[in-house]
Amino acid sequence: MKYTLTRIDPNAPIERYPAEKKQTVNDPLQEVGRGILLGKLENVLNSTVNWGRKNSLWPYNFGISCCYVEMTTAFTAVHDVARFGAEVIRASPRQADFMVIAGTPFIKMAPVIQRLYEQLLEPKWVISMGACANSGGMYDIYSVVQGVDKFLPVDVYIPGCPPRPEAFLQALLLLQKSIGEERRPLSWVVGDQGVYRAQMPCEKDLFREERIAVTNLPTPDKL
């Protein structure tokens, strides 16, 4: 599996945010020239740490626009987001693991979103929820940033206007799957300080043949 290695770029211009550089590499555990024992031990240690991270994701209680309503609906008893270990909503970004950009990222709001993202402690992740956060949506105007990934690194995109709560739950599952494949430093003092993220396949491409093969559409009373 191919991985994307992300490191801080000390030579990045001040105008660029975030100041990081990326490159495509192979699985770091396969490239390590160590003995079988140490290699297996590091693999087990990485898997254990990733298992704990992905099953205890604390979201930051933050919303910009109407998609936030659908996000909060996922925390009700009907959908029960506690099944995925993400029911502990935090009021401070310093206590959260990830933030969901749910709504329209206005230019005036972009510096605030950046500051909140910087206050998240590592490891941290970002979910872009809805067409407005993904690409500006129908607001192709001067006051809206055309995609939150213009100033934040996004891990999972949720399409829709607005997406249903089930789409948010699927995004959580995709984020958990991505976290399970990550290779992060086991210490801030020892070893490579880069972050290796697995290049996950696009969900649209995975189910393309299945969608094309559909010939019998359900009637409105069965939807």
Curated annotation (Swiss-Prot):
It holds the Pfam family Oxidored_q6. It catalyses: a quinone + NADH + 5 H(+)(in) = a quinol + NAD(+) + 4 H(+)(out). GO terms for cellular component: plasma membrane; respiratory chain complex I. One of its GO terms (biological process) is electron transport coupled proton transport. The keyword Kinase does not apply. It is a peripheral membrane protein. [4Fe-4S] cluster binds at C66, C67, C132, C161. GO terms for molecular function: 4 iron, 4 sulfur cluster binding; iron ion binding; NADH dehydrogenase (ubiquinone) activity; NADH:ubiquinone reductase (non-electrogenic) activity; quinone binding. It comes from the Bacteria. Its cofactor is [4Fe-4S] cluster. Its EC number is 7.1.1.-. Binds 1 [4Fe-4S] cluster. Its main location: membrane. The keyword Transport applies. Keywords: 4Fe-4S, Cell inner membrane, Cell membrane, Iron, Iron-sulfur, Membrane, Metal-binding, NAD, Quinone, Translocase, Transport, Ubiquinone. It is found in: Cell inner membrane. NDH-1 is composed of 14 different subunits. Subunits NuoB, C, D, E, F, and G constitute the peripheral sector of the complex. Belongs to the complex I 20 kDa subunit family. NDH-1 shuttles electrons from NADH, via FMN and iron-sulfur (Fe-S) centers, to quinones in the respiratory chain. The immediate electron acceptor for the enzyme in this species is believed to be ubiquinone. Couples the redox reaction to proton translocation (for every two electrons transferred, four hydrogen ions are translocated across the cytoplasmic membrane), and thus conserves the redox energy in a proton gradient. This is NADH-quinone oxidoreductase subunit B. The gene is nuoB.
